Amino acid sequence: MANNIDILDYCHSTNDVVQNIVNYKKNNDNYNYLEKHDDENAGISKNNIGVNSNYNRVFVFNNKRGDETKQIDTNMESITPYININSLESTKKINLVDESSKNYNMGNNWYHQNKYNNKMNNSKNSKNSHNKHISIAHIKYDDQEINEKGKNKLYEENQTNTKKTWKRRAFSPFTPGGVRSSTVLFLCTAIGVGLLSIPYVFSELGIILSIILILLNSLESYITTNILCMSSLEHNIFVYGNLLEKIGNKYYKTLIDFGLTFSFLSGYVLVLILVNDYLSNILYTFNFPSFISNRIFITIVICLLVLPLTFREHIGSINCFLVFSLFSITLTVLAVGYQSKYYMSLLPEKNISLFKINKHFFKCFNILLFSFSQQSNACFITGQFNQPTQRRVTKSESRSILIQVIFYTLFGLLGYLSFLNTTKDNIILNYEETNMSILLCKFFLCISFFFSIPLNFIATYPSMISLYTSIRNKIQKLYSVLFTRNEYLPSFSNILRYDTENPFDEYTLDENTENSSTSESQGDDMFQRKCAAIFVTCLCAFVEFNVSKLSNFIGIFGGFTSSIISCILPNLIYYKNMHTFKNKIERYATLALLCFFSVIGLISSIVTAFIIIY
């Protein structure tokens, strides 16, 4: 009897294990199905299953029984390779107690009957499992088909989006530091007063030679601009003078600072002269009062309007105005082209020159060199990029050069065909004062030249401060040598500097910024920037009041400084970094081209000066 009780306990424990195995098998099948289904659609992995999932309850059979129960479980798993789920569910607990010998035959019959039922159920389960696998395969196939359809839809949407990308880029607002805004900065730096003299070049040299020189100067401008931009990226320096100081020495820095400062001042005065002439002509044509069209009054108004723009530290805040400058130049080209046929019909002689060389060749070469001069702001514009990579910078500068070639070729050709050999050095002067379309172009050109002043000031400001600091330090050293034993030295040092403890110490480069040449030229020093802007504006206005025919003087010295800025110094930078180019033919061909333009630029400035003087 005791043995029967032990057997019953064992059977109960075994039945519990079997029931747990049944539950496990059900849960595991459901989990496997869900896992496969989810993996196909949502990509859920086993590592992402939560704590409450069936996967975490697989091995929890009967923890209350202890180690013996675990041993029984493992034995049953090893002995029974296959367990029929349905037979385990339908089979009742076996009663092994023999109450009488009569029940032996019944038990034997029950055993055979149960064995037969198990075979039938196994066949049914195999069919069900086969059908189940077929259904899962269908589900997988359907899911794959759905995924393929979804991918096709996404691909079609991406294709449509890429087709619309150029429209979105063309009409979306400019982002500061983007490729388009940087292209506009390059264009506004290069396209300026020199545009109005391009038709004069065509009249002096002919159409073919003028186009050849335009292409050559565009090639030179692209090479030198690319040299400056890539050198700025390589050394992480975005001021022209600082870049030359690192590659060469401090004398190169002083030279470029002087060249950039003088070029900006001369350009400022020239813009004031042209804007004053155009506005006075417009106001006089529309019968404004005489005091409004007065030269001094117009100059004061222009200076008061341009001062707040020069106080800005970053160029991104005036991007919209720079786009308007390009619009005004485009309008001028269209107006000249629209009237070219009419003015050409008025000419008595219609002799079109294709190729000719005369004494004005060097002067015309200088004009084209000025027109493509965007190198002065190349380092500054490179520093304005939000992602200054080589690909983005090259894309921006190449686009600007291409647009300049198109503008100059069209404007020069249309302007030359309008007046042929009677074309003046400023084509606007060929039109009568009552021409309304030209008056409108004059007004828009005034706006374009007006916004070129703050652009060039922001780029030239570090060079002006660096030049001022170097001159001040030289004066301090000179007085320190002359008056070392003089009692007036302390009072003089107090006048020059507030630092009485170390009055003759030179300023050094600021390690916290790379866009300033001295510690005084940091962007947060707004007071110093305002003082410099006011001083420069007053100086240029004073010169414009007293000298109205400064164009020849500016052409001589401006051409000389432009040759240094655009040809000689980029050539020096390329010569220092020439070892980085592996192709020797490309290396020496580029060096020869830069040397040619450097020599021609200097010779052109000298010859132009002699022609003007004599």
UniProtKB/Swiss-Prot annotation:
Membrane topology field: Multi-pass membrane protein
One Gene Ontology term of the molecular function aspect: L-glutamate transmembrane transporter activity
Annotated localization: Vacuole membrane
Domain of life according to the entry: Eukaryota
Annotated GO CC locations: vacuolar membrane
Keyword Transport: yes
Alphabetized UniProt keyword annotations: Amino-acid transport, Membrane, Transmembrane, Transmembrane helix, Transport, Vacuole
Ranges annotated as spanning the membrane: 184-216, 222-243, 255-275, 295-311, 318-340, 360-380, 401-417, 437-459, 531-547, 553-575, 587-613
Knockout consequences: Growth of the asexual-stage parasites and maturation of male gametocytes are delayed. Parasites are less virulent, their growth does not result in the development of cerebral malaria and causes less neuronal inflammation and cerebral complications. Asexual-stage parasites have swollen food vacuoles containing altered range of hemoglobin-derived peptides and less hemozoin crystals that are also thinner. Swollen vacuoles are also detectable in the male and female gametocytes. Parasites exhibit lower sensitivity to quinolines.
More about this protein: Can transport antimalarial drugs.
Family as reported in the entry's similarity comment: Belongs to the amino acid/polyamine transporter 2 family.
Primary role: Putative amino acid transporter. Involved in maintaining the osmotic homeostasis of the digestive vacuole. Important for the timely development and growth of the asexual-stage parasites and male gametocyte maturation.
UniProt name for this protein: Putative amino acid transporter AAT1
Underlying gene: AAT1
